[in-house]
Amino acid sequence: MKYLKRSILTLAIAVIPFHSYVNGCGGDYYDYMNYYNLFDQLLLENKGLQPFLLTTDYAFYGEDTNPDAEQQPDENLNAWMTFFKKNNTLQEMDTAQFKTLLYSASYQSLKQPSSPYVIALNKTDAGKQTLTYLQYAKELEPYAQLSENDGWWDMKRAASPSEETYAHYKNKGLELYQHCPYHELKLRYGYQLVRLAHYMRNKNNEAIRMYNLYVKPLKQEHYIYYAALEQTAGALYNIGKLANANYLYSRVFDHSDNRKKIAYSSFRIQSEVDWNEAMTWCKDNREKAAMYALRGYNTFSNELEEVENILEIYPESPYIK
């Protein structure tokens, strides 16, 4: 460890003559509030970690300039485009059209036979199955949205479905899942079922069961898998299984750039006991390194100690590059 620190110091001294200095903002707009910073933190190798760079003005670095849109690819959009390419569907569409279809098209427009998107999707079997899924997802959308009452600090779920409505959509989703021939779409149905149960508030155990039955068995390293894992972690947290929940949040943080901020904000360690219990869920040193990184990004943590912990068990970790 001493040799490593000495090497880092030597490297830092060596690059001083060749590196233009970088100013850091100290929390205000006046020159005297700036400080000297030898290293440009924007040279970070993993752009998915950019929101966690040093900042004194916002909860996450660059929130005023929305760096996510500039630095992080849309993992959901890319997953859809990969699926369409694999199944020779919607190949004439560009990225902007994909975004409109996936994020802006209404349920009503997806039910119109004359809609250009409906016509295009109906050209292939994968497209027809996608259209059926998107219609189902749009039906559930109102129950997953947030509403602002008095402001952003008082945001709540817009509505939970009644028990009757929940049963209807659950049964519909299960039927669509069973008859869908595409694993990528089955995974998305599984995610919808987990999320629907989780947002019912009194269906946390059912949300966990839905994950175990309809998401986990598909064994897909996919953005939607980690979105479902995040919902499952929330359900576990709601029933008091904090160690398991924190571990799952660390898995989401480790594997999905687009979900990192949510996973970080949801990760809650209140005592050494909580930490030790969460660590027992880790299967290898890579997973432990992600846990140390999550704890290290906390405002009140000892960052140097967490870096040393990671170096000791997993020196190739992306969190120290």
Regions found by a protein language model. Name each.
Residues 8-9, 198:
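Sequence-pattern detector for short linear motifs
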Residues 20-195, 200-321:
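Extracytoplasmic/secretory-pathway proteins
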Residues 10-17:
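Bacterial N-terminal signal peptides
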